Regions:
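Sec-dependent signal peptide recognition
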Residues: 13-22
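An acidic, Gly/Ser/Thr/Pro-rich helix-cap/linker signature
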Residues: 31-131, 137-140
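Acidic helix-start/capping segments at beta-turn-to-alpha-helix junctions
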Residues: 79-105, 155-158, 167-175, 294-302
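N-terminal secretory signal peptides that target proteins for export/translocation
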Residues: 1-12
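Flexible, glycine-rich surface segments
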Residues: 226-344
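C-terminal soluble interaction/assembly domains
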Residues: 298-435
Length: 435
């Protein structure tokens, strides 16, 4: 049925012995030092990613245990998994990248915003929109997510595929699953990345044509495609493709947008667009509703009292109007606002001023703001998406048909959200093209 514990131990010992042999040979090499050519520097940067012998041995032991567990639970031949991970290694630089900022670090909303809402990304966004306009409109109609929001997310994530990461995803997830840096939340973070590593393996297995459970057979599975999937590039956190989906999100929310029978978030813009729309829809995006409202200047003290950093919709819009944080119009669905009973939260975006004093910009986040937070758990990120979308022409206000507000007996004199977006885009297409 499955290999015995003795057999598993032999495999693990073989892998550890293999690592020790490679490192020993490297240490004993009599090859004279090579000049720092570009090729040699690139090679060194890869070789130096490996950790010390003891760390690599522990890494191999833990990885082997996980592969055995997956083999048993999914009936995947263990040898196939071991072959796919034979060259897996820890990446010390990644452990540094995931460390929390130092105690003296100050969050800076203005710097963050400037990094993402800038001419290069906006120009690329307009080009991406023009190249995919018809499909974006189709996805907007199907999902209710405005095209500008989808374009903004992909632009902020990777500049439409220009920056998708340069780490092998199996190395990233293995490193963070078994060698996460010493932080207070280390156990929870390691478990998260173990789960993502499992998801990666199952994702790659099915992408390569394998079935689950596999019934101890690789029949129908293309091993080349399986290994290629494990070795694909990712961010330092293991996110993949144009929209930077984690493996679990790919398995749960990614869709085949171009209809070629497979999901490819790295090379297919249509797959990326459709997948972002599907993710947002499944996480509660409300069609025709705004993302956030600015706080009234004279109500900043009131907003400060309610801001607690907890991403929960705690207050009604009516309550925020009564406190002077929002205007009456923002609680009027027929005038670009939302219904008074709609729930909201106070969003605080801190930054230091030129003198180093702490300042905060406040917004009222609505349901759709929180949906964006589900994509990337950061208030900075969510508000940047909203403002990037506005720079592309997104109208951050409600767009609801009159019959939905007043009932079917009233005259319809308002277009749907998708129709307005299409009309707006056609009318402003010349303006939106890059200079």
């Amino acid at each position: 049925m499955f290999n015995s514990q003795k057999s598993n131990t032999l495999r693990m010992n073989f892998r550890v012995s293999y690592i020790l042999l490679v490192l020993a040979l490297g240490a004993c090499s009599s090859t004279p030092p090579q000049p720092n050519t570009q090729a040699n520097i690139a090679q060194q940067s890869i070789v130096n990613q490996a950790d010390d012998v003891a760390t690599e041995a522990r890494f191999s032991e833990n990885l082997n245990a996980l592969l055995t567990q997956i083999s048993q639970s999914q009936e995947i031949p263990l040898q196939t998994l071991e072959t796919g991970f034979l060259d897996a290694k820890t990446i010390p630089s990644i452990r540094k990248l995931v460390l929390p900022p130092s105690g003296t670090f100050k969050k800076n909303w203005l710097v963050y915003r400037k990094r993402f809402i800038e001419p290069v990304r906006l120009k690329a966004g307009k080009v991406f929109w023009d190249e995919n306009q018809a499909f974006l409109s189709q996805v907007e109609q199907e999902s209710g997510v405005p095209a500008e929001i989808i374009v903004a997310i992909i632009g902020i994530e990777t500049i439409y595929g220009r920056q998708t990461g340069n780490f092998r995803v199996k190395d990233v997830l293995s490193t963070l699953a078994f060698s996460y840096p010493e932080t207070p939340n280390k156990p929870a973070r390691e478990q998260l990345f173990k789960d993502q590593l499992k998801e990666l393996i199952l994702m790659c297995w099915t992408e390569a044509g394998g079935k689950l459970p596999a019934k101890v057979s690789s029949q129908g599975m293309n091993s080349t495609r399986f290994n290629s999937c494990l070795n694909q590039n990712s961010s330092y956190a293991g996110a993949i493709g144009l929209p930077q989906f984690m493996p679990s999100s790919i398995r749960n929310y990614a869709v085949d947008g171009d209809g070629d029978g497979r999901i490819d978030l790295r090379q297919s813009p249509k797959d990326a667009i459709a997948s972002v729309g599907n993710f947002m829809k499944k996480h509660g995006w409300q069609a025709g509703m705004p993302v956030s409202f600015p706080v009234q200047t004279n109500a900043i003290p009131a907003a400060k009292e309610l801001a607690d950093g907890d991403p929960q919709l705690k207050y009604t819009v009516r309550e925020l109007i009564e406190k002077g944080i929002l205007t009456k119009q923002q609680g009027d669905l027929q005038n670009g606002g939302v219904e008074p009973q709609s729930k909201a939260l106070i969003v605080d975006l801190p930054y230091p001023d030129k003198d180093g004093s702490d300042q905060v910009q406040y917004f009222v986040g609505l349901n759709n703001f929180l949906t964006i937070v589900q994509y990337n758990r950061s208030y900075f990120y969510a508000q940047s998406v909203a403002e990037f979308a506005e720079a592309l022409g997104y109208q951050n206000q409600s767009v609801v048909p009159v019959e939905k507000i007043e009932g079917p007996t009233k005259t319809v004199n308002s277009k749907s959200a998708s129709e307005k977006t299409k009309s707006k885009k056609v009318n402003s297409k010349k303006k939106s093209k890059p200079a």
